[in-house]
Amino acid sequence: MKICIIGYSGFLGSYILKKLSKKFFIIKINLREMPEFDDKNFKNFLNKFNKSNIIINCAAALKPRSKRDFFINQDFPKTLSLHMKKMKKKFLFIHMSTINVLIKDRKDPYTISKRIAEKKLLNTNTTILRLPLLIKKKNGYIQKGGNLSILFNYLNLNFLPFYPMIFPGHTFKPVTLDNII
């Protein structure tokens, strides 16, 4: 079985890669190497996925600003799904999203782009996993990494007598990476 991991170098993707590479053949795809959508080599890039039985999309621009960032978050998953359908390829497509898409008050670019991606993936053969805050533990201790490092840095500010949480606030119900796989 061949499993393709998109975003294999990120916090979640690298963990999934480490766990699954012990049992399966892994195809690693880096979207930073992806040609522009209108580039003649874009189809060749998509063909890299053709031999995959399972595709796990962990790629995301957490602070999307550029046209490319938004393409990665909201358009690429649907583009890939349509490509694989066109190739008449049987595969399982797992798209990682965020639990924040369910919070209507969340208006940050990342959440909006993930919400759009989910809408575009409706009526496709895609499994969407909405993940909460992910944490990594080592020897029973929470490690600074992923989005948790933002919270650690925030709480490490020494000059504030209190720590305001900006509206709409965040609901932190962390899940350890070990519980994902």
State where each predicted segment sits.
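Conserved Rossmann-fold NAD(P)-dependent oxidoreductase catalytic core, especially the SDR/UDP-sugar
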Residues: 78-113, 123-132
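A conserved pocket-lining segment of Rossmann-fold NAD(P)-dependent short-chain dehydrogenase/reductase
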Residues: 153-175
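Non-catalytic, hydrophobic alpha-helical segments
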Residues: 55, 180-181
